Amino acid sequence: MSFRASVSGGPGRMAPMERTIDLRSDTVTQPTHSMRRAMAEAAVGDDVYGEDPTVNRLEERAAALMERESALLVPSGTMANQIAVNLLSRRGQEVIGESRCHIFNFEHGAMAAISGALPHPIETANGILHPDQLRTAYLPPGGHTNSSCMVALENTHNLAGGRVVPPARMDELVGTAGELGLPVHLDGARIHNAAAAVGVSAARLARGCDTVMFCLSKGLGAPVGSLLIGDRELIAEARVVRKMLGGGMRQAGVLAAAGLVAFDEVLPRLADDHATARRLAELIAEVAGILLDPATVETNIICFALDGSAGMTAAELADRLGEKGVLASALGANLVRMVTHYHITMPDAEAAAAALREVVAERATG
């Protein structure tokens, strides 16, 4: 049985299309009609000269959204993270972060290769650091060991299943880092999902962090871009590092235009994606051989494990789901990730769960 769906809807009214149910990531989103129109009509200039009016508007809105002085558009979240590390770290010193964070695991060792910084990973049960763990990990300058230079936080935490670091814990971590004399960078690729989940502003969650970045091309649905945000002096330095890394773009207003539409059309409805994810999680949890507590699904990411009775690896499960028109990501031997976004409807969630149930049942009957 195929679970491919024909849908029409989403912000800006996506054109109807026959498609698979793509739950691999929220990066698979297609630009809305409104985004495409805004991109085609965008006023542009040379952004390396600071002359692209649409980029300037996007950066001003992003800075205001985060209640900061300045923002910088860069091609990707990885580049934004690496610019921040370059500005806040020192060669041969350690960046303290949760062991599964994106900066440590999905950026190909860039902080070591580019900035000479070393990871100091801290393991947690749920992706959320405790201030005492920062104190224990901290290494002062001097002596015979590496020393700590900064703290990297992630909110929401991708590999922890989209868990939200709540405002009070963010305050504690930022405060502890300050006591230790360490600057803080927040990888807020999905910070707007975190904000929607706990009912506060993204600026509130990032309060006190020296730099914060968020992505336009995940749940917000724009095709390209992330923003690095901080004080005016730091972002002026970031502009130089962006150029060094090859991230200076010319008529980038065609990309920035989609981001402006995302702020208006997509950001206000992120909670809908969370509701879809919760429903999908509830249905997945009913499938034999699946280990998942739906209460842990706080945003748009679902991570579930396979127990021994499932009789297959995560990769095998993902392959069989793909044959039924449902795409998911295998993370290691027994962990599967699904991510909802504005293309995924409640009927899609139900169809995806039905496909999963069918795959597991087929395996059980041999």
Residues covered by each model-derived region:
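Conserved PLP-enzyme active-site core in the AAT-like
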Residues: 3-4, 15-324, 329-344, 350-366
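Short, positively charged and aromatic/hydrophobic N-terminal segments
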Residues: 9-14
